């Protein structure tokens, strides 16, 4: 077909060559080559110029668009150029697709008028700052993600728009959407700096709303969440009219159900009231006057307590603040506010337990006194430790700050000591400093006034959070039943909530009541989550009765029943035992007579046993220490004793000390805690200590991670130091100094590799994973990967540690645990492969940008399998790791495995990359594992990792374009669509593949894994496709999966489409 005159004219004007491109349609033309080498192309349809692509040419001048011969253009692709501004002439009214991505210098885009046919605009990764969108009634997709938008507006609604992505524009500030967005399904506003969101009208089709990382202060008035909304991200927004506990916290936390129910609950303003309660926690050393302050706040004439009346552990009382002014609260009228005072005793023996009750979004009074001196070494704690503890344990991840603190110095009537009034400046959450005398009430009124003044710093919604009468009615009922001390979650639902709150609302309300100190709810603990403490004093008393019992370890169970907890029922004692064990406060064992007994580390004696004679004495012990920051939680070594109880050597344990021995080594380690100085000390005896050292350090890491997650800490880390005989040196300096006796610090127990073995990283990693030693594989990988991959390995180690913690606590469903583990394993294999490639050895990678990656050891007869998968944010995690692994295992076990190349996996695949990947690898078998929906499409990912569905027609375009490549293989032998409801997508591509496996219903992950394992096992043993399919469905049938909720038995869901028209 002759070249259009306008193309020749543009070639001369721009001094380039513009080649024709034969594509089945315009969308295929616009998609193909996005990451290819062909930058200048045109597309003809019926002999007319329909598409123009001028990509990566450094174009700055847009005057060529004024050519009237371009009036018929429907697709314009100008990505990756250097335009500073662009104005679309009025004659480009036929445009359907406009791609301007990666124009970093582009500041403005202007339209001459309405664009009646425009369906898609891509301005992602551009420098665009201002965009005024004209009337675009046909617009379906608008992507301006990761750009520089500061101002954006719609001239009118876009009734066909189903995808809007403005994420990553940090200065957008405001978004206003007129009524009429009836088709909008995906609205991405992640980290766009939005402070005000105005949505007029309903969004009935909305599926995903991503508002994470903005500065939104008010939820749009009367915007209720549509029934079809599946995902809502609100993390990081200081929204005042939705309580933080309802919004939830944590990166990528989906809060859709809790927020939906809350918005519905407050829709009737006549039934809505404020909560106006919070927790105030008094902390400090013993005998500094915390209880005196509490008594004087309640009654200034109250008698001060005697020493014998000092708080034992914890007292909880309400304190009413009267008539707080509108100037303070921001409300229209004065209000009363209730603070629930938690007064902690300062005795050292309670310190480990007290940490359980510290919480974010509370007001802390840290109390010291003029006579508060370190004479009593056991009970005295320094100012810095107390403040570090409060700063860490009160951290609120949602507000990214710690709870406010008022620093109070009592007893100024006594002999005055030097008080450093500026010390609190080291901690940003200390709001005020007050020196008082409870005895003479000196300056006490100033303290009383400071409490309400600091109160707004507790939380964003402390005065404004509203709840309807059903929620508040549930709270009142729980308070009436406080005399029962505790109830089960089911009793709470059936007898208290009744039909007033659904399950999501009921749990959210418990979290709020726990935060303000009304109840104690162990929602994060699988064993205790069905137990609700109505009277916090009751459970406090039970735990402190153990500590105050004076018993010696081990404590027989009968002594708990007959003496310590004799006034509790058998079921209550059982739950209390679970509480002690769940928080590593005790462990259970059997004595020589088979009787149950408990070891409670908090009851250990101070006196050290004569243990040195029991340990090797050939050489002096090696000295190590772990330096913790910002704190070392008191009782950390006690928790270590509980978790490593099987390694305690001959029962050698005493206050803050224990000796461990591993049966697989000849070494022993004495561990000592100095929580005030933030150190744990290790004395290592004997030979080859790497096993026991690794056991101790990995368990300490687990304890750290558990504590961080349970208390929502921002950080809690430790570094390793060794004593070389003269000074303490950090671990890395020990290695540089050549301290050979510390070589075990770099050994990996059970992992035998040498530096020269780095060429076989993948083999070593696979071997460890096959033995279910994922942690060891990660540690080995950390030692062998190049520097630029270390951060990724450390991230995987953190994820695996969290997975182990969640698994141990029982808070993960089996399926979720398997999914996360397999994702980690898949990432490990990818990193190992990349590390090998960096050592000039061929490996497999999961990076689409690695152009040197290929199938290994293949001939023209070798068949190639390409595994495409994606699990975008906002969707449940797919178990594709296990599915892919099953294919690899089947190949390794097959007699004829050399007929097939080792499969390649590509994760997090974008729809725009699929054709590029297929063209590169030329697979014989294409296996696709994705989320899918009959009505919405196959879910690939976009650049931000979010769900981007494509229709059956778009999927067909991609496969058809691939099959039409004259330089490629053409038809694909087999396509496996391991996706839910994939029949329509398979039917659309029947002309381009010989065999297609599809599904006619939802397809469970576990069934997909079984199918893949058996299907490929048969293929690898030279069975035909039909037989392999029948064998795989039979394997599913033998599993007898329940089919409740499915339209078909599970084994009938996958079926085979054959196409003999070759």
UniProtKB/Swiss-Prot annotation:
The keyword Transit peptide does not apply. It is an enzyme of class 3 (hydrolase). It comes from the Bacteria. InterPro entries: COR-A, EAD11, Leu-rich_rpt, Leu-rich_rpt_typical-subtyp, LRR_dom_sf, P-loop_NTPase, WH-like_DNA-bd_sf. PROSITE patterns: LRR. Might be a Bacteriodetes scaffold. This is Roc-COR-CHAT protease. The lineage of its organism: Bacteria, environmental samples.
């Amino acid at each position: 077909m002759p070249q259009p005159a306008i193309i020749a004219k543009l070639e001369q004007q721009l001094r380039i060559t513009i080649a024709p491109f034969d594509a089945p349609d315009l969308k295929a033309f616009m998609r193909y080559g996005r990451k290819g080498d062909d930058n200048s192309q045109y597309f003809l349809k019926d002999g007319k110029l329909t598409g123009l692509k001028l990509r990566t040419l450094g174009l700055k001048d847009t005057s060529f668009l004024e050519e009237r011969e371009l009036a018929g253009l429907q697709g314009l692709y100008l990505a990756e150029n250097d335009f500073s501004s662009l104005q679309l002439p009025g004659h480009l009214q036929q445009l359907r697709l406009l791609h301007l991505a990666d124009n970093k210098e582009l500041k403005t885009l202007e339209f001459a008028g309405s664009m009646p046919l425009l369906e898609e605009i891509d301005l992602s990764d551009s420098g665009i700052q201002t965009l005024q969108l004209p009337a675009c009634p046909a617009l379906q997709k608008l992507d301006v993600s990761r750009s520089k938008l500061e101002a954006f507006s719609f001239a009118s609604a876009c009734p066909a728009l189903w995808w809007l992505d403005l994420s990553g524009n940090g200065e957008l500030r405001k978004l206003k959407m007129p009524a009429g967005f009836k088709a909008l399904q995906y609205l991405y506003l992640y980290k766009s700096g939005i402070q005000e969101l105005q949505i007029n009208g309903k969004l009935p089709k909305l599926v995903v709303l991503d508002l994470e990382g903005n500065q939104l202060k008010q939820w749009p008035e009367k915007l209720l969440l549509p029934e079809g909304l599946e995902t809502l991200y609100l993390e990081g927004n200081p929204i005042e009219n939705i309580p933080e506990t309802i919004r939830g916290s944590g990166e990528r936390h989906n809060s859709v159900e809790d927020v939906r129910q809350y918005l519905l609950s407050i829709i009737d303003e006549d039934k809505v009231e404020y909560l106006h309660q919070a927790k105030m926690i008094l902390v400090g050393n013993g005998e500094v006057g915390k209880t005196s302050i509490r008594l004087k706040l309640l009654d200034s004439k109250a008698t001060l307590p005697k020493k014998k009346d000092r708080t034992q552990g914890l007292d909880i009382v309400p304190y009413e603040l009267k008539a707080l002014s509108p100037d303070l609260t921001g409300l229209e009228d004065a209000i009363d506010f209730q603070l629930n005072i938690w007064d902690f005793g300062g005795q050292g023996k309670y310190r480990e337990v007290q940490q359980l009750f510290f919480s974010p979004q509370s007001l802390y009074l840290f109390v010291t006194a003029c006579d508060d001196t370190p004479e009593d070494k056991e009970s005295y704690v320094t100012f810095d430790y107390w403040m570090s503890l409060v700063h860490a344990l009160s951290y609120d991840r949602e507000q990214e700050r710690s709870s406010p603190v008022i620093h109070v110095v009592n007893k100024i009537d006594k002999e005055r000591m030097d008080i450093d009034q500026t010390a609190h400046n080291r901690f940003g959450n200390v709001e005020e400093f007050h020196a008082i005398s409870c005895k003479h009430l000196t300056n006490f009124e100033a303290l009383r006034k400071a409490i309400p003044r600091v109160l707004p710093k507790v939380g964003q919604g402390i005065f404004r959070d509203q709840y309807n009468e059903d929620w508040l009615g549930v709270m009142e009922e729980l308070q009436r039943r406080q005399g029962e001390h505790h109830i089960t979650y089911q009793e709470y639902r059936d007898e208290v909530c009744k039909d007033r709150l659904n399950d999501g609302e009921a749990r959210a309300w418990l979290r709020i009541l726990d935060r303000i100190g009304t109840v104690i709810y162990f929602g994060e603990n699988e064993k205790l989550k069905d137990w609700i403490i109505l009277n916090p004093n009751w459970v406090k008393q039970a735990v402190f009765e153990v500590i105050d019992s004076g018993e010696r370890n081990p404590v027989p169970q009968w002594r708990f029943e007959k003496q310590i907890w004799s006034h509790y029922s058998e079921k209550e004692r059982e739950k209390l035992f679970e509480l002690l064990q769940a928080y590593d406060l005790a462990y259970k064992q059997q004595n020589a007579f088979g009787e149950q007994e408990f070891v409670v580390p908090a009851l250990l004696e101070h006196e050290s046993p004569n243990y040195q004679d029991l340990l090797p004495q050939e050489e002096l012990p090696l000295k190590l220490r772990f330096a913790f920051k910002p704190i070392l939680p008191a009782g950390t070594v006690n928790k270590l004793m509980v978790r490593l109880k099987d390694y305690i050597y001959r029962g050698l344990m005493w206050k803050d000390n224990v000796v461990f021995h591993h049966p697989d080594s000849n070494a022993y380690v004495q561990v000592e805690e100095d929580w005030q100085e933030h150190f744990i000390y290790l004395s290592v005896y004997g030979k080859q200590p790497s096993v026991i050292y690794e056991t101790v350090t990995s368990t300490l890491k687990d304890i750290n991670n558990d504590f961080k997650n349970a208390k929502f800490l921002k950080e809690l880390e430790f570094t390793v130091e060794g004593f070389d005989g003269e000074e303490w040196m950090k671990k890395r300096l020990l290695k540089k100094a050549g301290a050979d006796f510390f070589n075990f610090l770099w050994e990996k127990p059970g992992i035998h590799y040498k530096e020269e073995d780095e060429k076989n990283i993948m083999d070593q990693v696979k071997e460890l994973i096959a033995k279910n030693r994922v942690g060891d594989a990660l540690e080995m990988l950390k030692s062998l990967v190049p520097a630029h991959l270390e951060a990724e390995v450390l991230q995987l180690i953190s994820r695996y540690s969290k997975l182990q913690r969640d698994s141990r606590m029982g808070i993960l469903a089996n399926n979720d645990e398997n999914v996360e583990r397999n994702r980690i394993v898949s990432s490990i294999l990818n990193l190992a492969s990349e590390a090998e490639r960096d050592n000039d050895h061929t490996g497999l990678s999961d990076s689409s940008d690695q152009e040197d990656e290929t199938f290994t050891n293949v001939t023209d007869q070798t068949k190639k399998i390409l595994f495409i998968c994606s699990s975008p944010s906002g969707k449940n995690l797919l178990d594709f790791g296990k599915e892919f692994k099953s294919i690899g295992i089947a190949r390794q076990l097959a007699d004829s495995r050399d007929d097939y190349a080792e499969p390649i996996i590509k994760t997090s695949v974008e729809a725009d990359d699929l054709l590029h990947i297929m063209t590169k690898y030329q697979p014989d078998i294409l296996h696709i594992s994705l989320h899918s929906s009959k009505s919405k499409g196959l879910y690939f990912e976009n650049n931000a990792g979010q769900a981007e569905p494509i229709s059956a027609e778009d999927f067909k375009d991609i496969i058809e374009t691939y099959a039409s490549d004259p330089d490629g293989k053409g038809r694909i032998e087999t396509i496996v669509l391991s996706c839910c409801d994939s029949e329509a997508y398979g039917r659309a591509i029947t002309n381009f593949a010989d065999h297609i496996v599809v599904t006619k219903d939802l397809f469970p992950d576990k069934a997909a894994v079984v199918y893949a394992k058996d299907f490929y096992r048969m293929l690898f043993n030279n069975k035909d496709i039909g037989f392999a399919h029948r064998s795989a469905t039979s394997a599913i049938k033998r599993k007898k999966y329940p089919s409740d909720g499915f339209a078909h038995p599970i084994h009938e869901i996958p079926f085979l489409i054959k196409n003999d028209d070759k």
